[in-house]
Amino acid sequence: MSSDQAKDRAKAAIVGSLVADAATQPVHWVYDHNRFYENFRNKSEPEFNSEWLNPYYRYDNGTFSIYGEQNYVLLKHLVENKGFNLKKYMDAYYRHFGPGTNYDQPQSRDRLPKQGPWRNEHITRALNKIQSGDQRSGTDVAECDSYAMITPLVAMYAGSGQLDSYVEQVVRVTLNNDRSVRTAQFFAKLLEHYILHGRDPEAFRKVLNNFPDDQYKFEWQKAYYDRDLSNNDAVRKYGSGCGLPGNFQGALHWVHRNEDYVSSVRTTIRSGGCNCPRACGVGAWVAAQYGSQCIPSNWISRTSRGNEIVQYADQLSKMMQK
């Protein structure tokens, strides 16, 4: 496979992940399944939903969730720095989410929905440690940010042999937790396979077999092979919230479906709950298989920073470290 094809797949993974996140955000964190079903029963196009159903916060349509925003911060850092530097990444993360930013707003579950973007509590706690220079500043919780935010890192370092180390460094800034790290590393290895090799129905099996044995492999394998369930039912079975392993299992259940980009994102949107990180993951996996042409141009234009992320992704793909 030519390097030009790999570069296009790397670019597609970045854009596909972030556009999917933006397309999903208006219906992020909706846990009332009956309300969700009623809203989408007669809608063939759930993306960029005009009615903001998210009960926790209100924000502009086309913007990124907190998961996509972390993805974007990493993308921007990699391009501007021409590679990963932990100290500079921590500084960029703090500047983007820390004091004086739109994310540094009072938020209380007693006064919902909040007006403006949401910052998860474990990020707030991590920011306090980042300021002190602690390189493992993250909170000890297993959350889906771990895999949802690292697509740009995979795109740059696919095939380089450095991916595991860099993934761990990035994740521990926010989530100093072994399950979070291992989940992100497995997500990265599967995405790396798609970027380097394109579509491969055996990708999951190959990556799983080559992944070090640990207590998490069975959970991932179980979700992937649970093929009798619809994705909606799989998400309900494994957990529609933000925690791991459930959130990642819901994303992994998609892998065997072999759907195109649009169908994949729509399926993920309709699964409800904490669907933005699943959209980040699924959007990256499927776009890396089909290439940049699979992402609808009108979806990119409906993404607030759509043109910017395309430009950043193009620049990053030319800096791939393989």
From Swiss-Prot:
Transmembrane segments: none annotated. Pfam families: ADP_ribosyl_GH. The keyword Cell membrane does not apply. InterPro entries: ADP-ribosylglycohydrolase, Ribosyl_crysJ1, Ribosyl_crysJ1_sf. One of its GO terms (molecular function) is structural constituent of eye lens. Keywords: Eye lens protein. The keyword Cell wall biogenesis/degradation does not apply. Expressed in the rhopalia. Present in both the large and small eyes. Belongs to the ADP-ribosylglycohydrolase family. J1 crystallin subfamily. This is Crystallin J1C. It comes from Tripedalia cystophora (Jellyfish).
